[in-house]
Design a protein with these regions (language model features):
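Blade-level signature of beta-propeller repeat domains, shared across WD40, Kelch, NHL, RCC1
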Residues: 283-316
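Beta-rich, blade/repeat-based domains predominating
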Residues: 34-48, 80-93, 126-147, 177-197, ...
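Short loop/turn segments that connect beta-strands within beta-propeller blades
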Residues: 66-71, 113-117, 163-167, 212-216, ...
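A short helix->beta-strand "capping" segment at the edge of beta-propeller domains
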Residues: 17-36, 272-280
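Beta-strand-rich domains and repeat architectures in extracellular enzymes and scaffolds
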Residues: 24-61, 304-307
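Conserved beta-propeller blade signature
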Residues: 50-53, 96-99, 147-150, 197-200, ...
Length: 316
């Protein structure tokens, strides 16, 4: 019991008690490229500490893989250039990618191994026609029970739930009462709570909300978040990529403890048009994806036509 209590205290004070150092020159871009390429996606980390970042355009579009030092390793086979949101999950002890296909004419979801093997594909036609026929799917993740959740964040704001076999189960949430979602951009399963919840980035409303696993509205977790795009967890902490600049780190109660890379120039955030010559070290433009690594370091990928990654290491 004492060990559990001590761990809880350490995690709860982690961000408040430590500072973060911006890592200049991280990562090293693929050979021959000055930037990673047009980015409007996500970043996540595998169990070996390698980073996976989705890139929508350029010579190395798809998913680029970097080691912890920032060295480019390779691109992931069969990863498409429309993986707007994806999550690295563990299945039977193996790392697996769950990806939503934004703007695809036939595919809603792909499940890939980290070798690039296609393990499951869910077609758009799996969603019943009475629910809709035009979608803009922005993120996917695996529920604690193995179900697949995909969110329609650039269209209806509805959350689509499929079984592990890819068969459609139901749709939930949306723009109506009580959710009132407006650009439900991405989400994550919040296992800090029992039972687990869904933490949704309600981007246009500048807030994070909690749903139960059925999609029922529970509560507003945090407000005043500047266009939240994605969330990731490290112990009791959650980091939030904010399209209107900066990475916020919140505690379990939804209180902002730290803000990294804040930009005070409105012309340089909430846009993908800030060219490399205008980038400032340690200052974000439009963070779109973010992840913690196992040590609590923070990496973000921006919405940027040239493509940009930034990293902060926690000072212990």
């Amino acid at each position: 019991m004492k060990t559990i209590l001590l761990t809880t205290v350490v995690l709860a004070t982690f961000a408040a008690a430590h500072e973060y150092d911006f890592q200049k020159g991280w990562p090293t871009t693929p050979e021959g490229l000055k930037t990673i390429g047009d980015s409007h996606g996500e970043i996540d980390v595998d169990s070996e500490g390698n980073f996976y970042v989705s890139v929508v355009g350029g010579e190395k579009s798809g998913i680029q893989i970097y080691d912890a030092s920032g060295k480019y390793l390779r691109n992931l086979p069969n990863a498409r250039n429309n993986f707007h949101g994806f999550t690295m999950v563990k299945e039977d002890g193996k790392d697996v990618i769950y990806a939503a296909c934004l703007g695809d004419k036939t595919t809603a979801f792909l499940k890939l191994s980290i070798k690039g093997e296609v393990l499951l594909e869910i077609p758009l036609s799996a969603i019943p026609a009475e629910i809709g026929t035009s979608f803009a799917l922005t993120h996917a993740d695996r529920a604690p029970n193995g179900d697949i959740y995909v969110i329609d964040g650039y269209a209806s704001d509805r959350l689509f739930i499929f079984g592990a076999d890819g068969k459609f189960k139901r749709a939930t949430a949306g723009k109506g009462e009580p959710w009132k979602l407006n650009t439900a951009h991405k989400f994550a399963f919040d296992t800090r709570f029992e039972p687990a919840r869904i933490l949704v980035c309600d981007r246009t409303n500048d807030r994070l909300i909690h749903l139960d696993l059925e999609g029922n509205f529970l509560s507003v977790y945090a407000t005043g978040i500047l266009k939240p795009c994605t969330v990731d967890f490290h112990g009791d902490l959650v980091c939030v990529a904010q399209l209107a600049s900066g990475i916020s780190i919140l505690d379990k109660e939804g209180k902002v403890l730290k803000r990294l890379g804040a930009n005070d120039n409105p012309a340089e955030f909430n846009t993908n048009g800030v060219a490399p010559e205008k980038w400032r070290e340690g200052i974000t433009t439009s963070p779109h994806g973010a992840t913690f690594d196992k040590d609590g370091n923070v990496v973000t990928t921006e919405w940027n036509s040239w493509g940009r990654l930034l990293r902060w290491n926690v000072k212990l």
